[in-house]
């Protein structure tokens, strides 16, 4: 049997390292993306062909048209596996796998990694702690939630990635008024209790239903605060061997098992209740984390999550044994902010610990630092946050829907 053929789906511009990693295995690599992304700098040297879908006004695809196009392509080209490179492509890939009976995650399991309501129900039923929540289907259930669970609450979309579309609510009256504004879209949202706490993320690779690599990090400002308070985004690897790391590695493995994860990258978020110190599951996804967290993980560990995810997918399809690269145990941290300047000059940041700069996105500044000492990483991130706030920072309202 020859090397497998992969159809990669990306409705946003991302995943070039995945495409390169896949091509490095000798696999055939096809990419399907939105027509509006035709002129983005895709890793074309890694592609055997690229196909475009005419997107709708909100970047949606007509999946019946996509299926018809793929059916035509498959008359002459063999497709062995389909991979979604972004959260918003998980359902597309699952639909196509089901329709063409291609191995991989189907539509039911894919909901565990895309639908925030399905995630909470699945986690709760598996005995994993989650914040108190309710669907927004039945008025009496919502009224019961509002009368028994102390405010504040968060109303959040079931399907969006990141903190887009969320609203903090402080009373039952405010909740009902907000649900009125959602109208017929209400069923696409859920409500859950908001408890202040620190938010952590586990970025991992799974093979054969087991987590084979993971790094635990802490957001130094929560994603919600950054998105809605116009803050500065920061994250750092937690201390190795710490109680927090051990608990979160265990919880992450429990989530992956409960949700039916077999093989993929994953990005999973947890919150540590400020009052009790207990961890609660927030959400997960079967993809590499956004906001350049993959670059931070690579700086700390030497593992490029995009590249290794591709190698893992190919090994499963071949089938061959997947082997991780050599892993390093350094500490790393990231800082990213909107800027007033279109192309900010970052030359004032010249510490030897800097290993990465965000240079291809206008009105943004981003830096990753690495050190064998976590204290040094935090010291630098704290210093940089003050300087970014003073010399560069700009804020914009959080969008209702993602823009990239």
Segments and roles (model prediction):
Residues 129-131, 152-155, 164-201, 216-217, ...:
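Conserved ATP-binding module of the ATP-grasp superfamily
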Residues 173, 193-261, 265, 272, ...:
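ATP-dependent carboxylate/phosphate-activation module, predominantly the ATP-grasp catalytic core
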Residues 72-79, 147-149, 184-185:
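Glycine-rich phosphate-binding loop signature in dinucleotide/nucleotide-binding domains
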Residues 98-165, 170-172:
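A conserved helix-loop-beta module that forms one wall/lid of the active-site cleft
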Residues 136, 166-171, 205-207, 239, ...:
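Short beta-strand-to-turn element immediately C-terminal to the catalytic PLP-Schiff-base lysine
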Residues 1-109, 137-140, 317, 382-400:
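ATP-binding N-terminal substructure of ATP-dependent carboxylate-amine bond-forming enzymes
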């Amino acid at each position: 049997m020859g090397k497998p053929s992969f159809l990669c789906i990306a409705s946003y511009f991302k995943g070039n390292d995945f495409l390169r990693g896949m091509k490095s295995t000798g696999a055939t690599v096809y990419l399907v993306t939105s027509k509006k992304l035709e002129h983005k700098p895709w890793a074309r040297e890694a592609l055997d062909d690229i196909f475009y879908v005419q997107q709708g006004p909100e970047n949606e695809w007509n999946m019946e048209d996509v299926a018809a196009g793929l059916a035509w392509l498959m008359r002459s080209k063999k497709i062995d596996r389909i991979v979604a490179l972004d959260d918003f492509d998980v359902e597309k890939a699952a639909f196509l796998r089901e329709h063409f009976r291609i191995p991989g995650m189907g539509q039911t399991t894919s909901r565990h990694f895309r639908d925030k309501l399905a995630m909470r129900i699945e986690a709760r039923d598996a005995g994993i702690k989650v914040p108190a929540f309710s669907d927004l289907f039945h008025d009496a259930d919502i009224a019961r939630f509002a009368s028994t669970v102390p405010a504040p609450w968060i109303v959040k979309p079931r399907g969006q990635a990141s903190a887009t579309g969320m609203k903090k609510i402080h009373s039952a009256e405010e909740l009902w008024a907000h649900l009125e504004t959602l109208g017929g879209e209400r069923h696409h949202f859920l409500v859950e209790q908001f408890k202040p706490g620190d938010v952590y993320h586990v970025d991992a690779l799974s093979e054969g239903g087991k987590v084979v690599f993971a790094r635990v990090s802490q957001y130094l400002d929560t994603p919600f605060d950054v998105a809605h308070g116009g803050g500065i985004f920061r994250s750092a690897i937690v201390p190795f061997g710490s109680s927090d790391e051990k608990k979160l590695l265990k919880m992450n493995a429990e989530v992956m098992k409960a949700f039916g994860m077999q093989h993929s990258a994953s990005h999973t978020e947890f919150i540590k209740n400020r009052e009790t110190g207990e961890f609660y599951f927030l959400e997960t996804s079967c993809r590499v984390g956004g906001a350049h967290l993959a670059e931070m993980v690579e700086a700390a560990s030497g593992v490029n999550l995009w590249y290794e995810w591709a190698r893992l997918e190919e090994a499963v399809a071949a089938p061959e044994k997947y082997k991780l690269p050599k892993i390093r145990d350094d500490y790393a941290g990231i800082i990213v902010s909107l800027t007033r300047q279109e192309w900010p000059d970052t030359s004032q940041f010249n510490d030897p610990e800097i290993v990465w700069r965000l240079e291809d996105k206008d009105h943004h500044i981003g830096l990753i630092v690495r050190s064998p000492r976590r204290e040094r990483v935090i010291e630098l991130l704290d210093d940089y946050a003050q300087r970014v706030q003073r010399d560069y920072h700009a804020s914009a309202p959080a969008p209702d829907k993602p823009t990239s």
